Amino acid sequence: MIELDGVAKTFDGGVSALQDVSFSVPTGSICALLGHNGAGKTTTIGILSTLLMPTAGRAVVAGHDVVREPDRVRASIGVTGQDASVDIMLTGRENLVLFGRLRGLRRKQARIRADELIEQFDMTHAADRTVLTYSGGMRRRIDIAASLVVPPAVLFLDEPTTGLDPRSRRDVWALVSSLSAQDVTVLLTTQYLEEADVLSDSVVILNAGRVVADGTAEELKSRTGFVYCQVSPVDPADLSGIAAALADFRGLEVDRDMNTVSVPADRGVATLGEVFRRLDDRNIDLTDIALRRPSLDEVFLHLTEPPVTA
């Protein structure tokens, strides 16, 4: 379990990175920590992994206070950063054995554990090749596997799929999802909103060092409160006609790439009926008309402000 209560962090020079951050992650669940660059995600991970000291507040990881019991916290966690921590000149197997030895396993235990992880992570075919020859997806696999050599109670994943192709990203998703079945608590930061939607049991959104939303992805979508009516014409040439017919709707959006027109549906089904009537009067044929809730991407944009640039 992870708990933060009123955590703040101010760096030298008075730069405030976190302000009154509070949230919790139950044992065996996956929480996605979202925010723009500079929102405080990496600082939060740094505090929870004892790399940084909080200026105020309390943080508990796996039952241990990060300030009073840092050694116990470190013994309970695994951390995978944005850059791979493995030695690219060693084989995958050699890396896992090395990490096992560094974590206190005897040589035989380290070899046995390495073999278990190689099989679990489907790396048998590449285990005895140097990591230098691995694809980006394979490097992320071996990196995550290394953080699990001694099974942690809590695993921190800092943007685990950045730079990966879609197939490799989904492979990593499958690996991360399997961890909750092993009662591992996972806190991950990510720039990919789809990733958070697919993987997470809960989502925490940071903006300028503060928590602006905390809940499941579905709860956040519902809490945002807006629903829109989206239509798709049979003939893309009708997009302009649809826009003209619905011109009095505030917030109308035309997406020519997706062949859709969307308007806010403040009255729900009544709005959908009004849209359908207007387009029917103009003899515009549709392939689809529906009420839709916002995506997690739209929720994120709604709740956060762009970072201030100099």
Positions of predicted regions on the chain:
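ABC transporter nucleotide-binding domains
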Residues: 2-4, 9-207, 212-213
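Non-catalytic surface loops within mature trypsin-like serine protease
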Residues: 13, 27, 125, 235-236, ...
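Conserved NTP-handling cores and scaffolds of large molecular machines
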Residues: 103, 224, 228, 250, ...
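ABC transporter nucleotide-binding domain
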Residues: 173-266
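C-terminal coupling/interaction segments
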Residues: 267-310
